[in-house]
Amino acid sequence: MSLLSSRAARVPGPSSSLCALLVLLLLLTQPGPIASAGPAAAVLRELRCVCLQTTQGVHPKMISNLQVFAIGPQCSKVEVVASLKNGKEICLDPEAPFLKKVIQKILDGGNKEN
């Protein structure tokens, strides 16, 4: 004689077809990173400073692009990353006088009328 009735012995749960469907979906899902190193990577930088050391000077004609990263939770200092025409990226000292001149030239160059 059983203490539980035959109805109480059955535990309700997901059907076998639902379990099979979930297993199939898990097998078909490709493992990999959720976010790739695309444009979102620039926004979602690692939470650390980009520049571990800075270069004091570089000729302004060698610079093709400047990126300025403000103080934030990732780093307690302003960082300036210069992309050079040869493809390299270097960190520049944001307090360097030459960099202030380069930034001023860039700002003045955009306001010139031809």
Curated annotation (Swiss-Prot):
Its main location: secreted. Residues 1-36 form the signal peptide. SUPFAM superfamilies: Interleukin 8-like chemokines. It comes from the Eukaryota. GO terms for biological process: antimicrobial humoral immune response mediated by antimicrobial peptide; cell-cell signaling; cellular response to lipopolysaccharide; chemotaxis; inflammatory response; neutrophil chemotaxis; positive regulation of cell population proliferation; signal transduction. Belongs to the intercrine alpha (chemokine CxC) family. This is C-X-C motif chemokine 5. The gene is CXCL5.
